[in-house]
């Protein structure tokens, strides 16, 4: 075979490989939103305008063997792209079918079977620029795997996760259960363990919600116990009222306790959401005391925010 034929066949093979590698199509989704927020008390003060700045690239398909494959990449301005996976933020690959369940590999931005449940009943209202640190949880996020078992019984979801650590980082494993077999009721339990050299930490979450008529009630508690260091506990509850198909009102409260501190961080918020003609307007007022476990004025912070999002 002469060199010209070899070059031609090599180019054809490369073209076929490239074609098969990019056989799936990716779609792009974003959101149109604008808002204003105002902080007072401890931390940063003043008003700030905001707008949606996140794009999600996603694609999916099915192999000849009947395995569903989906891929997701998120571009989020200002998020932690400095970890080396930039320009992307969260990104994951998902494999699933009815008999094998669902396996998710997260290169960044994943959750453990415990941390996926540890969002507080009030909706993590601490995470509003008030100066409150993120509560501790079982390690996950980068280079982690989450497996959701196929259905074992009606209305029961079982998940398991593992993060191998690496480069001296902690390894972690977790398991979680959610049962929704009673009308209006959902109950979840998650437990995770994080191991580093000479230290071990356990995180557990229990939470539940119950919808009755126009009301929804929620409770949650997460405990983080560590061999060396201070233990953490977060307790939360919420009450939501659906006024109509368009309008809802929610009140939520959280208490963050840390071993070694006599002052708890306490957060409460009231919010409302109204939807009409493809536009959703939301407003919230949030108040915190004991920020950074400080007493008096030094530990007080407030925020109000208003936002509008558009579906089209």
Q: Where are the regions a protein language model picked out?
A:
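Outer-membrane beta-barrel proteins
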Residues: 1-312
């Amino acid at each position: 075979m002469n060199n010209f034929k070899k070059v031609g066949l090599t180019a054809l093979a490369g073209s076929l490989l490239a074609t098969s590698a990019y056989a799936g199509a990716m779609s792009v989704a974003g959101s149109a939103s604008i808002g204003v927020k105002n902080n007072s008390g401890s931390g940063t003060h003043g008003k700030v305008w905001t707008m949606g700045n996140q794009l999600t690239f996603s694609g999916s398909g099915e192999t000849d063997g009947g395995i569903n494959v989906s891929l997701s990449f998120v571009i989020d301005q200002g998020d932690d792209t400095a970890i080396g996976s930039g320009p992307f933020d969260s990104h994951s690959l998902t494999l699933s079918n009815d008999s094998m369940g669902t396996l998710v590999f997260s290169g960044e931005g994943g959750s453990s079977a415990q941390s996926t449940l540890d969002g507080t009943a009030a909706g993590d209202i601490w995470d509003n620029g008030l100066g409150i640190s993120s509560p501790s949880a079982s390690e996950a996020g980068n280079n982690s795997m989450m497996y959701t078992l196929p259905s074992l019984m009606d209305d029961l979801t079982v998940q398991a996760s593992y993060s191998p650590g690496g480069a001296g980082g902690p390894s972690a494993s977790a398991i979680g259960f959610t049962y929704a077999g009673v009308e209006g009721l959902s109950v979840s339990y998650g437990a995770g363990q994080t191991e580093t050299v000479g230290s071990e930490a356990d995180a557990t979450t229990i939470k539940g919600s119950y919808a009755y008529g126009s009301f929804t009630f929620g409770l949650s508690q997460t405990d983080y116990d560590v061999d060396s260091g201070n233990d953490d506990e977060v307790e939360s509850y919420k009450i939501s009222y659906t006024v109509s198909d368009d309008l809802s009102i929610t009140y939520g409260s959280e208490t963050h306790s840390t071993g070694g501190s006599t002052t708890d961080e306490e957060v409460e918020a009231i919010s409302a959401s109204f939807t009409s003609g493809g536009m959703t307007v939301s407003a919230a007022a949030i108040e915190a005391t004991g920020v950074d476990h400080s007493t008096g004025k030094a530990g007080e912070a407030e925020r109000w925010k208003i936002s509008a999002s558009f579906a089209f």
